[in-house]
Curated annotation (Swiss-Prot):
One of its GO terms (biological process) is division septum assembly. NCBIfam families: minC. The gene is minC. This is Probable septum site-determining protein MinC. Keywords: Cell cycle, Cell division, Septation. Belongs to the MinC family. It comes from Bacillus velezensis (strain DSM 23117 / BGSC 10A6 / LMG 26770 / FZB42) (Bacillus amyloliquefaciens subsp. plantarum). HAMAP family: MinC.
Length: 226
């Protein structure tokens, strides 16, 4: 299938279907008109009676939900075509803010007392203790420069690579993603800082903090951030 060009649409056939590169400088109405003209002229079929997947590339154009639906409906009006994906190189401010928050390291200096809950979207660096009955939650990793004697939940948004580290690891409950470990019996008071993580089988493991550099070599964002 050869590449064909219209004023606002470039179509390329691939082994995965059709890829539509849409002009990102024209108005949305002009884009719809150009796409409508292209669809009315060209006929697309795989010769087997199956629908052809369409992958849309928007470039530096952002589509609102209503616009995306109009685009999808227009392509779906051709009975042999179905939209598989819509990709854009730009995102909404809200999405950008959410991504920023998830990648942030939030530093807090306090004692989390019984009944209190400390919640952050990204990584948490707590300078202080978590008393029994206190809870800390983070979408990313948890680092406690103090005693962890309450509840710690890291990776609550589905991050199974999150870790929990503490100067004194004596929790009543540890949770990473959805994996729960209640007051691990083998944790004993000592001088070594410890960390908890999920192994390749999804089991929670407690190790000396020195092992963290080998277990999660990508954890370098704290450098220069403390």
């Amino acid at each position: 299938m050869k590449t064909k060009k219209q004023q606002y649409v470039t179509i390329k056939g691939t082994k995965n279907g059709l890829t539509l590169h849409l002009d990102d400088a024209c108005s949305f109405d002009e884009l719809l008109d150009g796409l409508q003209n292209m669809l009315s002229i060209e006929q697309y079929t795989d010769g087997k009676g199956q629908k052809i997947s369409v992958h849309i590339k928007l470039g530096h154009r952002y589509l609102y939900q209503e616009q995306a639906e109009k685009l999808t409906d227009l392509i779906a009006s051709k009975k042999d075509l179905v939209v598989h994906s819509i990709d854009s190189e730009v995102i909404a401010k809200e999405e950008a803010q959410r991504m920023k928050e998830e990648q942030e390291i939030v530093s807090v200096s306090k004692i989390v007392r019984s009944g209190q809950v400390l919640h952050v979207t990204g990584d948490l660096l707590l300078i202080g203790d978590v008393n029994p009955g206190g809870t800390i939650r983070a979408g990313g990793n948890i680092f406690v420069l103090g005693s962890l004697k309450g509840i710690a939940h890291a990776g609550y948004n589905g991050n199974n690579r999150a870790v929990i580290a503490a100067s004194e690891m004596m929790p009543t409950q540890l949770r990473i993603n959805h994996v729960l470990n209640r007051s691990p019996d083998h944790i004993q008071k000592g001088n070594d800082m410890e960390c908890a993580y999920l192994d390749t089988d999804g089991n929670m493991v407690i190790e000396r903090l020195q092992q963290l550099a080998h277990l999660r070599p990508d954890l370098t964002r704290l450098e220069g951030g403390m």
